[in-house]
UniProtKB/Swiss-Prot annotation:
Keywords: Coiled coil, DNA recombination
Name of the protein this chain belongs to: DNA recombination protein RmuC homolog
Organism, scientific name: Rickettsia bellii (strain RML369-C)
Parts forming coiled coils: 25-80
A Pfam family the protein falls into: RmuC
Function: Involved in DNA recombination.
Family: Belongs to the RmuC family.
């Protein structure tokens, strides 16, 4: 019996739980039922309101329907009246249009005739111009074709010339000369093209350009080129070999010492020499660096500076600035010397002007004495003779000579003290 007690307790507990669940479920259902009842009541009220609104709208619809029928009847009456008016107007317009059509047809015929004649005339003129222009165009095309063929042959000739070593060298020299001329430097004063000299061992050197810089500085430019620079094919090995040969040749020529020695013989003192290797294009510089990345370091090690047109223009701008500044300094000294000469000339002119003034004073004084004596002695006797009945004929004698006097005075110079009372001396 004891083992049945737990089972009975469990069953009892289950029954109690079921009762509680049923109770809760019933309460929930009652609540939902109450909610649904209230909601149903609300829906019923809404339906009644909607039915009332429906009745009101139906009444309005009936009223609007009556109005529409009245308006339709009015429209029909208006349409009937309009049709009758339109028929009357149509008949009148038809008669008027018939007359206008006749007139317009006559005018149109006349205009068509005139327009056809004018069009035929314009077409004939345009055809003549077109034919002449077409003939001229054919002639121009033929001439242009000949020019293109000649230009093609010329371009081929230039290309072949540039692909030769001599042509490439001439291109670099021409480019260098054009840059120097356009830089603002003075030919044969600030720079010299194709300067030739002979060394002590009878070796002839000819740098392409010498630029004379202030303070005893000298810039030597030697243009170098290779046919591989203008060739579109990839010849990096040949280009590197050629440009390294040019660099070695330029370094072995020792322009610096030989040019300094040659210029010193001509009593031109220069102490420092800058050597530039000029390449005709910036693309040429890039090609050389791409062919031999160590080319610039090799050149700098030999105190040689490879440059293209842009680099050369920058260096020439700086050189022009130095030359202009040096020229301004020299002109400054010349101006001071000229001012000294001018001041000396002013002193000489002042002496001469003083002498001229003294001479003028003496001349006017003597003239005044002469006029006084003439008026007092001579003219009085002339008047006495005229009183005796002797006239001068057609000539009218003056009553007296005018007298002049010179008033001399010393100029007073008013000196105004400036902020800096001591004048600044110009340093020579």
């Amino acid at each position: 019996m004891n083992y049945l007690l737990p089972s009975a307790a469990i069953v009892l507990l289950v029954l109690v739980s079921l009762n509680i669940w049923f109770y809760i479920k019933v309460r929930t259902l009652k609540t939902e039922l109450q909610f649904l009842t209230d909601q149903n009541l609300e829906i019923t009220n809404n339906n009644q309101l909607l039915n009332q609104e429906k009745i009101a709208y139906l009444q309005k619809i009936e009223q609007l329907k009556c109005r529409v029928e009245y308006q339709e009847q009015s429209i029909k009456d208006s349409e009937k009246i309009r049709n009758e008016s339109f028929s009357s107007a149509k008949a009148a317009l038809f008669d008027l249009g018939k007359d206008l059509s006749k007139q317009l047809i006559e005018i149109h015929k006349m205009e068509n005739t005139a327009a056809r004649e004018l069009a035929e005339k314009n077409i004939a003129t345009a055809s003549g111009k077109f034919n002449s222009e077409f003939e001229r165009l054919i002639t121009m095309v033929g001439t242009l074709n000949k020019d293109i063929e000649q230009s093609k042959s010329t371009v081929d000739l230039i290309k072949q010339s540039l692909l030769s070593p001599i042509g490439a060298g001439l291109l670099a020299e021409i480019t260098l000369e054009n840059i120097l001329k356009s830089s603002g430097l003075r030919s044969n004063l600030d720079f010299i093209m194709q300067y030739g000299l002979t060394t002590s061992d009878s070796t002839k050197l000819r740098p392409d350009a010498l630029i004379f810089l202030p303070s005893g500085n000298l810039m030597v430019i030697d243009s170098k080129a290779s046919k591989f620079l203008v060739d579109e094919q990839d010849n990096s090995g040949n280009l590197s070999k050629t440009m390294n040969y040019h660099l070695k040749s330029l370094a072995n020529k020792d322009y610096a010492e030989n040019i300094l020695a040659d210029l010193n013989k001509k009593e031109q003192n220069y102490n420092n020499v800058i050597t530039l290797m000029f390449l005709p294009t910036e693309q040429a510089v890039e090609k050389v660096i791409a062919a031999d990345p160590n080319f610039l370091q090799k050149a700098w090690g030999c105190s040689i500076f490879p440059v293209g047109p842009s680099g050369l223009m920058n260096m020439l701008s700086f050189a022009k600035f130095q030359i202009t500044d040096h020229r301004r300094s020299e002109n400054y000294k010349i101006i001071i010397e000229e001012v000294r000469k001018l001041l000396s000339s002013i002193g000489t002119i002042a002496d001469y002007s003083q002498k001229i003034g003294n001479n003028l004073h003496n001349m006017v004084t003597n003239y005044d004495k002469f006029a006084a004596s003439f008026n007092r002695n001579f003219m009085s006797r002339v008047k006495n003779i005229q009183k005796l009945g002797i006239d001068s004929g057609n000539k009218t004698l003056p009553a007296s000579l005018e007298r002049y006097q010179i008033v001399s005075s010393k100029s007073e110079i008013i000196e105004v003290e400036a902020e800096n009372s001591q004048p600044q001396q110009i340093e020579e």
